[in-house]
Amino acid sequence: GVACRCDSDGPTVRGNSLSGTLWLTGGCPSGWHNCRGSGPFIGYCCKK
């Protein structure tokens, strides 16, 4: 999967670890949660 930035990773991508996984359709898989709260974002940033 493609890494994405969770809200807990910090305000910017540069210098921060990306702990989420990008899911484009259907929301996050079972047992995962969306870790990205708001902002212009395509798909869902999911985390176990």
From Swiss-Prot:
SUPFAM superfamilies named among the record's database cross-references: Defensin-like (SSF57392)
GO cellular component terms listed in the entry, alphabetical order: extracellular region; nematocyst
UniProt GO BP: regulation of signal transduction
MF GO annotations: sodium channel regulator activity; toxin activity
Main localization (coarse): secreted
Disulphide-bonded residues: C4-C45, C6-C35, C28-C46
Keywords: Disulfide bond, Ion channel impairing toxin, Nematocyst, Neurotoxin, Secreted, Toxin, Voltage-gated sodium channel impairing toxin
Signal peptide: none
UniProt keyword ATP-binding, yes or no: no
Pfam families in the cross-refs: Toxin_4
Localization: Secreted; Nematocyst
UniProt record similarity statement: Belongs to the sea anemone sodium channel inhibitory toxin family. Type I subfamily.
Known function: Binds specifically to voltage-gated sodium channels (Nav), thereby delaying their inactivation during signal transduction. Thus it strongly stimulates mammalian cardiac muscle contraction.
Protein name stated in the entry: Delta-actitoxin-Bcg1a
